[in-house]
From Swiss-Prot:
Lineage top rank: taxon: Eukaryota
Positions where Phosphoserine occurs in the chain: 440
Organism from which the protein derives: Mus musculus (Mouse)
UniProt-recorded name of the protein: Transcription factor Sp9
Gene name in the database record: Sp9
Listed GO biological process terms: embryonic limb morphogenesis
Length: 484
């Protein structure tokens, strides 16, 4: 194998990885570079990694060797193929780490490669050739030409701490490796929250949860161990099922230690005591509010009467117990000099005061209207002009009107008043004027009786005038022929 590696001309394939391995072989070789084969060799042969002259290696055997070295189930499949399957190309494909990594673990490469070759039925001479080729691949010249090959592997520290066969399990747990992936027994990261109680934190790291984690992750150990054994057996990074389970358990330990620690201390005894105290305070406050509910309602009712600032309420407040008679009357007068209007409710007084201040808080929300009014009943009456509603109906002719004053004018026409007919059928809104007084049905009937009496008197006067005129005409007719 060593003779074929050093002295035989390589046959190039079409993949970049094959070209890379061949170029590295040429760099380490002391003989002058050989010329490339004809273009027909690329079309005929396909990919043949350094096959012997005595035996022919097809594409399937080389690919099977590559699959075993990267993700196979075990090293036992190496014995089923030819010696070319366990080739230097497989070693180069499974060791993309830096030259520093290979120099640190140079002795381990040769030992583990010899052990893997013995397990697969390969002679020690071939294993020595493999180690010689590894020393050729990881050189400073290769780092200069191909910087990606010489770049430090992003998971180099992970390989060292998790899969190296010479590291003890205690070194990983004690924090011997100084990488971000390692799990330490006492991490000092920013995610950690110190708990003064300590009892809850110690329960997380006890032996029972760790045992349960190992039992839960036991189903993943066979697949994981076979994967790591086949992938890293030729590079000296092979590990057993115990190391794989230890890696999984430490990752779960990281989740339990750093992920859930900031959440769990919030449920400590001190916070629970604070929550219980707050709950008891709320319950006691609710009980006190329920006990003094009637007194609070009475106090609100009494204080509501004292909120009015009219002269009558201020006088009753000043007099104290002597002003009880003023409070019983419940009269609220306007404080504007010269007004003197009195109302029985504070809301009516407030509505009246808007006339003095010019405040108009009630706005018509009809489209493109936007008129403002002082009182809500004015706004409701104005809205009837938009909707066309006529609430007031005539009892005689059943004619309907929007406003009560319009109805009263219309009733006068039925009683023979005549003078109030002008504008009686007008439905125009006078909302910009002061609100008219509300007319009761008794007042409407009284007005109609007065108008009827006036009409009767007018009719009697007209009849008397007609009788007088008739009598005067008769006298003239009687004296006329005598004069002639």
């Amino acid at each position: 194998m060593a003779t074929s590696i050093l002295g035989e001309e390589p046959r190039f394939g079409t993949t970049p990885l094959a070209m890379l391995a061949a170029t590295c072989n040429k760099i380490g070789n002391t003989s002058p570079l050989t010329t490339l084969p004809e273009s027909s060799a690329f079309a005929k042969g396909g990919f043949h990694p350094w096959k012997r002259s005595s035996s022919s290696c097809n594409l399937g055997s080389s690919l099977s060797g590559f699959a075993v070295a990267t993700g196979g189930r075990g090293s036992g499949s190496l014995a089923g193929g030819s010696g070319a399957a366990n080739s230097a190309f497989c070693l180069a494909s499974t060791s993309p780490t830096s030259s520093a990594f290979s120099s640190d673990y140079g002795g381990l490469f040769s030992n583990s490669a010899a052990a893997a070759a013995a397990a697969a039925g390969v002679s020690p001479q071939e294993a020595g050739g493999q180690s010689a080729f590894i020393s050729k691949v990881h050189t400073t010249a290769a780092d200069g030409l191909y910087p990606r090959v010489g770049m430090a592997h992003p998971y180099e520290s992970w390989y060292k701490s998790g899969f190296h066969s010479t590291l003890a399990a205690g070194e990983v747990t004690n924090g011997a490796a100084s990488s971000w992936w390692d799990v330490h027994s006492s991490p000092g990261s920013w995610l950690e929250v110190q708990n003064p109680a300590g009892g809850l934190q110690s329960s997380l790291h006890s032996g029972a949860p760790q045992a349960s984690l190992h039992s839960q992750l036991g189903t993943y150990n066979p697949d994981f161990s076979s994967l790591t054994h086949s992938a890293f057996s030729s590079t000296g990074l092979g590990s057993s099922a115990a190391a794989a389970s230890h890696l999984l358990s430490t990752s779960q330990h990281l989740l339990a230690q750093d992920g859930f620690k900031p959440v769990l201390p919030s449920y400590s005894d001190s916070s629970a005591a604070v929550a219980a105290a707050a709950a008891s305070a709320m319950i006691s406050g609710a009980a006190a509010a329920a006990a003094g509910g009637s007194s609070a309602r009475s106090a609100r009712r009494y204080s509501g009467r004292a909120t009015c600032d009219c002269p009558n309420c201020q006088e009753a407040e000043r007099l104290g117990p002597a002003g009880a008679s003023l409070r019983r009357k419940g009269l609220h007068s306007c404080h504007i000099p010269g007004c003197g209007k009195v109302y029985g409710k504070t809301s009516h007084l407030k509505a009246h005061l808007r006339w003095h201040t010019g405040e108009r808080p009630f706005v018509c929300n009809w489209l493109f209207c936007g008129k403002r009014f002082t009182r809500s009943d004015e706004l409701q009456r104005h809205l009837r002009t938009h909707t066309g509603e006529k609430r007031f109906a005539c009892p005689v002719c059943n004619k309907r009107f929007m406003r009560s004053d319009h109805l009263s004018k219309h009733i006068k026409t039925h009683n023979g008043g005549g003078g109030g007919k002008k504008g009686s059928d007008s439905d125009t809104d006078a909302s910009n004027l002061e609100t008219p007084r509300s007319e009761s049905p008794d007042l409407i009937l009284h007005d109609s009786g007065v108008s009827a009496a006036r009409a009767a008197a007018a009719a009697a006067a007209a009849a008397a005038a007609a009788a007088a005129a008739a009598s005067a005409g008769g006298k003239e007719a009687a004296t006329g022929p005598n004069d002639s």
